[in-house]
Structures are given as structure tokens and as C-alpha cells.
Amino acid sequence: MSTIKKLYIKTWGCQMNEYDSSKMADLLESTHGYQLTDVAEDADILLLNTCSIREKAQEKVFHQLGRWKNFKDNKPDIIIGVGGCVASQEGEYIRQRAQCVDIIFGPQTLHRLPEMINQVKGTKSPVVDISFPEIEKFDRLPEPRAEGPSAFVSIMEGCNKYCSFCVVPYTRGEEVSRPCDDILFEIAQLAAQGVREVNLLGQNVNAYRGETFDGQICSFAELLRLVAAIDGIDRIRFTTSHPIEFTDDIIAVYEDTPELVSFLHLPVQSGSDRILTLMKRNHTALEYKSIIRKLRKARPDILISSDFIIGFPGETQDDFEKTMKLIADVNFDMSFSFIYSARPGTPAADLPDDVSEEEKKQRLYLLQQRINQQAMNYSRAMLNSVQRILVEGPSRKNVMELSGRTENNRVVNFEGTPDMIGKFVDVEIVDVYANSLRGKVVRTEDQMDLRIHESPESVIARTRKEDELGVGVYQP
């Protein structure tokens, strides 16, 4: 009698890593029958998908591997793998320092995991593959599997911008776009499984230039319109973008494509032109604000979020005040803001880290307080309004209630019935909290005038006619 083989994946970092981890799980289930478990001690394979953005990323990895080594001491056949950006950076060093590790793979080689596992089982020797094969991994992954009404789809990998503080070009490689038709086919498959909202992923999605079936190049703006035309997809989100390639043709999509949500994450990092130059961002604060003005002209109700790095080398009080002014001018809704810490191998790591930790913490506190206040103002403005939300499932606050997300990315908790999950409902916002809203259902999807979704099979069945010889003829 065969026992079920179990897989445990621990994921740190961005949505791209979350997406990669889900693909690893699907891949190893299809090739080896591994079933995901939430209990590391029960697993036959332990995979750590790492992120190198935060300070002391390496030590965090080795600390986790130290715990997993104890499992391997008790169960020698366990296979331990390390992937992600720290694996790309540290490769052989991980093997030297943590000899319990069997497999080391990068973000672009996760599709080779089945072969690596077989090799480790056969030879009992470790495998390291942190190469950058162009986009090959998407050709080797199993068909997508929906896990709710919202799904992530990777459209490109890597980044060519080489900001002075960032490790992404070194850990994920330079920009490579997936073929347009592959993306559209994956999204159509997800839509057929009930996905209503798709989030397009990439380190710099607005640099997307994917090849079409006839050898032409599809821009990001064109891709957005093509995705919006897929039957069943009612909402489109994307992350992350770089200001220097947020072009007018992308902004124009906000004017004529209602499926594209009124929420945008557009990182600026600093409001000081001097610091932006040191960061090698290749744009000014004024140019950033110009993009926002155009966006708000195209979509007046759009909300903007951003990334900010606090205490970058050389940042003065005047530089910080310029960042605070930009925050007020743009009126950001939310931010991902962090104290600067040098990433090994980046140009900024050679700059003197001359802002004290105390000053960094104080500036971060002031920045986050300002943005939290602005976010609360936006939330209060939604009080008593009716918002359309996509119901994602039970609420985290109360499993007897449901939770969904507004178009502008607000979480709403409300009383509802299980049949609402995966559908849209209109709710009146009746209360406002720091990180969520409370709503009351006023309209279900059945009462909305939404476009009718039909599968290709249903269209054929409805339009099929046979001639006198019994040959099927289809007349849409």
C-alpha cells in the first residue's frame, strides 16, 4: 500500500515568489504525486523559496535551514531544497555552510525540480542549478489551477533597470516577456475554472513586449485590452511598474477599459531628485507627478500606492521633507515603506550608510503616520457609499462572515451566504476600520446587469445546425 508523499514549501517575499511556490506545488504533484502539507515535520520534501530584499536575508535562510537539519537528522531521506533570490545570489555558499541542503535552484530553474529530485534520489549527491534559461520554465509547468475567484499570472521575468539599491537584475535576470498567446491561453483556462479577477505579475510589467503568434510584438497596453476581452474576466490588476515606462498608451487603457481596476501600485522610492539620481531611477519627482496627473484625468477615482526607501545613503532632512511633500501632493493611499539596508553586490552598497538608525526609524514613523492618515481619509470618504466587491471567501476576522475586495483594493467584511463566494456583490459601507471596511449587502450578482459569460462549448451547442446529410454547421 503506497503512502502519500508530502511537500512543504515556505515562502518569503513578493507576490512573484508566491506565484512561483504555487507553480512548484502544482508541478511536483503532477510529476511525483506530492501533496502539500502545512506541517514541515510530516514532509518528504522541504522547499524554502527565499527573498533577498530584506536585511539579513542570508542569516534568515541559514536559521531556517538549521531547524530543518534537525528533521533530516531524524529522517535522513528528507530532501531539502532552497530556491528564490538568495539561492541565485549565494548558490554554492549555501551548500558549503548548510550541507543538509540537497537542491539549490533559482527562480528561472524551478521547472527543473522534478529532474533535480530524481537526480538526488539516484546519486545521493546535491544539485545546484541557478542559471537563467530564457523563459523556459513556463513551457514546462502544468496547466493552471484556480484556487478561488482571483489568480496571479506571470507575464514576464527580470528587470533591466539596475536601480542602485536593487538585487533583482542579478537574481532574476534581465527582462524576458512571455509570448502573448501563452498568457492569454493561461488566463482563459483560469476563467473557465471560475476566476473573475486576474493579477498580472512581473518585476516591471509595463516593459512587457511579448511575441504574438504571427511574429509581431504585443505591448503592455495591448495585452491589457486583450485580457479584458477574455470572457469571464471582470477585473484586471497588475504589479509592479516603473515610472519611466508608464507610457501614455497604458494610461489610455484606463479611459476605455473598465475591467482595469481603479488602483495602481507605482513605486517612486523618494521625493528628492538628488536621491532619485543616486538610486539610478532615471526620473524626477515632477515627472512622477505628471504621470499621476494624467492617470487621474483618465480615471478620476484611481487610488495610488507606492514603495519608499527611508534613509538611503546621503539622505538629508531636506531630502526627506521633499519625500513628505510628494506624499502630500500625490495623496497616496498606501505604501510599502522600508528602512534602507545595503544589498551585497549592488552599487549602493559601496556608498557610506551615513544616516543613523535612530533617524531612519523616526523618518519611517513620520512617513507611515502620514500615509495611514491619508488612507483613513479615503476610507471615510467611502462611508455610506455602495461598493462592488468580489467575494473571496470567509472573513479572517469572523469565519461566520464573508470577505471581499473593492475595486480600489479595500477589504470589506460582511454577513452573507456561501453561494456568494466567487461572485460579485454590492455592499453599502457602514463602518470604517484601520485595515478594513464593514459592509451590508444591497445587491447580489443575479440582480446586476453584468455581461453574460458563455463557454465555447455552450455557444457551439446553442448554434449548431445540421444539413440534410447530418453535417454540423455553426452560425453564431
From Swiss-Prot:
Cofactor or coenzyme needed? [4Fe-4S] cluster
What are the annotated disulfide bridges?
none
Query: What residue stretches are annotated with the MTTase N-terminal domain?
Result: 5-122
Q: Which residues bind [4Fe-4S] cluster 1?
A: C14, C51, C85
Q: Where in the cell is it found?
A: Cytoplasm
Q: What is its main location?
A: cytoplasm
Cite the Radical SAM core domain residue spans from the record: 145-377
**What's the domain of life for this entry?**
Bacteria
Query: Under which EC number(s) is this enzyme classified?
Result: 2.8.4.3
The answer to whether keyword Transcription applies is: no
Q: Which SMART domains match?
A: Elp3
Xref: InterPro entries = Elp3/MiaA/NifB-like_rSAM, Methylthiotransferase, Methylthiotransferase_CS, Methylthiotransferase_N, Methylthiotransferase_N_sf, MiaB_methiolase, rSAM, rSAM_horseshoe
Keywords, A to Z, come to: 4Fe-4S, Cytoplasm, Iron, Iron-sulfur, Metal-binding, S-adenosyl-L-methionine, Transferase, tRNA processing
* PROSITE patterns named among the record's database cross-references: MTTASE_N (PS51449), MTTASE_RADICAL (PS01278), RADICAL_SAM (PS51918), TRAM (PS50926)
SUPFAM superfamilies according to UniProt: Radical SAM enzymes
Q: Which GO terms describe its cellular component?
A: cytosol
Q: Which Pfam families match?
A: Radical_SAM, TRAM, UPF0004
Name the HAMAP family for this protein.
tRNA_metthiotr_MiaB (MF_01864)
Assembly description: Monomer.
Q: Which PANTHER family match?
A: CDK5 REGULATORY SUBUNIT-ASSOCIATED PROTEIN 1, MITOCHONDRIAL TRNA METHYLTHIOTRANSFERASE CDK5RAP1
Identification of the protein by name: tRNA-2-methylthio-N(6)-dimethylallyladenosine synthase
Instruction: Say which species the protein is native to.
Output: Proteus mirabilis (strain HI4320)
The gene is miaB
